[in-house]
């Protein structure tokens, strides 16, 4: 098998990773704007990324896989930074720290809010990925609750975790669309008060 030679001192694998990263960034730029994913084209994505069209298919088999990869990439970064914010907070402030980080992240970069929480996106790939991300954050929430209560995650913890994550998601979505007239600090205060209200241990007893 012939090995790919370095080009301008950059190995082939690094060039591929660089092109993929540029395509993902272009995807966030386009999907986080007012463009409906149904209107995305491979040519448009590559033009935004500044790469030749042929390079799209070395990383993604089709447009739906690309949209899913952009969403996964965004969620992975948001989850990692949110977990870091929670870990750095005092025990009694961890719910607020996580919520504040999410709200302030989408306030700093509105593209994140439109992609992850926006009502205007009806693309099937995005809808599926949102469902997956809610399940993922519910799992993280359940682990957090289980650690606080010092007990294994059970069905009641799972039920509350899904309820809280779904409620927070819909509330942020309504806030972004202008349906909730609160500033970001007030929103975090309100969400924190609601989430903290689910800290009653009796809710989680079998």
PLM region spans:
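C-terminal peripheral helix-coil segments that are non-catalytic and often amphipathic
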Residues: 1-4, 143, 171-206
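N-terminal intrinsically disordered/low-complexity leader segments
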Residues: 1-18, 149-152, 203-206
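Helix-turn-helix
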Residues: 33-65, 69
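Short, basic, alpha-helical segments at the C-terminal edge of helix-turn-helix-like DNA-binding modules
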Residues: 42, 70-79
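Hydrophobic alpha-helical connector segments
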Residues: 83-111
């Amino acid at each position: 098998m012939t090995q790919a030679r370095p080009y301008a001192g950059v190995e082939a694998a690094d060039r591929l990773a660089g092109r993929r990263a540029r395509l993902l960034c272009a995807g966030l730029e386009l999907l986080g704007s007012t463009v409906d994913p149904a209107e995305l084209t491979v040519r448009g994505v590559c033009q935004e990324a500044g790469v030749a069209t042929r390079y799209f298919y070395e990383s993604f088999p089709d447009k739906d896989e690309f949209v899913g990869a952009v969403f996964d990439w965004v969620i992975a970064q948001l989850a990692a930074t949110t977990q870091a914010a929670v870990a750095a907070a005092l025990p009694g402030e961890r719910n607020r720290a996580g919520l504040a980080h999410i709200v302030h992240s989408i306030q700093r970069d509105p593209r994140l809010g439109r992609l992850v929480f926006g009502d205007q996106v009806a693309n099937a790939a995005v809808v599926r990925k949102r469902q997956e991300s809610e399940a993922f954050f519910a799992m993280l929430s359940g682990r957090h609750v289980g650690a606080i209560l010092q007990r294994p995650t059970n069905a009641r913890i799972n039920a509350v975790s899904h309820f809280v994550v779904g409620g927070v998601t819909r509330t942020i979505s309504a806030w972004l669309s202008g349906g909730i007239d609160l500033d970001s600090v007030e929103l975090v205060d309100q969400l924190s008060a609601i989430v903290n209200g689910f800290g009653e241990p009796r809710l989680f007893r079998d």
